């Protein structure tokens, strides 16, 4: 009789392979995850799961695999500051912006180098959100890094200015790195940051495929051996 350990490993690898092939071969498949970072002068929940509505602020990111390229869809939502649905979409493969839509408020971003971009000028420089090879992307090296996208790296350190004297400005700092090969359809990414340090964050990945593989492995083992 096949050993229990070997049996589980074989079933797991088989199901994992099916899931990975399905994700990588389908155009337009999406993986949704949520990042919860530290906002310097606002109160918000430290950890957010999935894309559920919560009081406070959060940043959600979607990765889409399409024709071998990665498109980063980053949306900044702020219930407190009433900057709702500000949407910026970049093509990480060739560093061009696909589209941009904002909520109607004037929003300014300050990037890692300290350069400030308005919503209008930022459309031409959005690709610094995206990077490859595990390097921190920036305005000048993003094109070279994205020539070989084998990982997804997002690094943010900017200030959002609502251009409204009645609404407080705030700064968002976050860092996220994830190997592209580890991202699968249905994954739920959650991250939390210590409010005492806006640059630190911890993250966990829950993979439904792993859980299902485990259940099926146990079920098949019980059926065949008892």
Swiss-Prot record:
Inducing or repressing factors: Induced in iron-deplete conditions (at protein level). Repressed in iron-replete conditions by transcriptional repressor fep1.
Residue ranges of the region described as Heme binding: 72-101
Keywords: Cell membrane, Glycoprotein, GPI-anchor, Lipoprotein, Membrane, Signal, Vacuole
Phenotype of null mutants: Impairs heme import into cell; simultaneous disruption of str3 exacerbates the effect.
Lipidation feature positions (GPI-anchor amidated serine): 199
Record's subcellular location: Cell membrane; Vacuole membrane
Residues in the signal sequence: 1-20
Propeptide: 200-226
GO terms for cellular component: external side of plasma membrane; fungal-type vacuole; plasma membrane; vacuolar membrane
Primary location recorded for the protein, binned into one broad class: membrane
GO molecular function: heme binding; heme receptor activity
Biological function: High affinity heme transporter involved in the assimilation of exogenous heme during conditions of low cellular iron.
Name of this protein: High affinity heme transporter
Taxonomic source organism: Schizosaccharomyces pombe (strain 972 / ATCC 24843)
């Amino acid at each position: 009789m096949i050993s229990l350990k070997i049996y589980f490993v074989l079933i797991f690898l088989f199901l994992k392979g099916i899931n990975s092939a399905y994700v990588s071969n389908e155009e337009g498949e999406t993986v949704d995850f949520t990042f919860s970072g530290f906002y310097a002068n606002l109160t918000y929940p430290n950890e957010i799961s999935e894309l559920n509505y919560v009081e406070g602020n959060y940043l959600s990111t979607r990765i889409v695999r399409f024709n071998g390229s990665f498109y980063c869809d980053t949306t900044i939502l702020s219930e407190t500051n009433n900057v709702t649905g500000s949407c910026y979409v970049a093509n990480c493969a060739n560093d061009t912006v696909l589209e941009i839509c904002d909520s109607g408020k004037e929003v300014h971003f300050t990037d890692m180098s300290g350069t400030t971009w308005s919503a209008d000028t930022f459309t031409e420089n959005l690709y610094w959100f995206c990077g490859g090879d595990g390097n921190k992307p920036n305005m000048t090296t993003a094109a070279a890094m994205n020539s070989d996208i084998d990982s997804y790296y997002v690094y943010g350190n900017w200030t959002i200015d609502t251009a409204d004297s009645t609404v407080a400005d705030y700064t968002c700092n976050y860092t996220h790195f994830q190997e592209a090969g580890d991202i699968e359809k249905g994954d739920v990414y959650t991250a939390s940051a210590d409010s005492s340090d806006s640059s630190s964050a911890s993250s966990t990945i829950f993979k439904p495929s792993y859980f299902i593989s485990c259940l099926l492995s146990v079920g098949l083992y019980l059926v065949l051996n008892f």
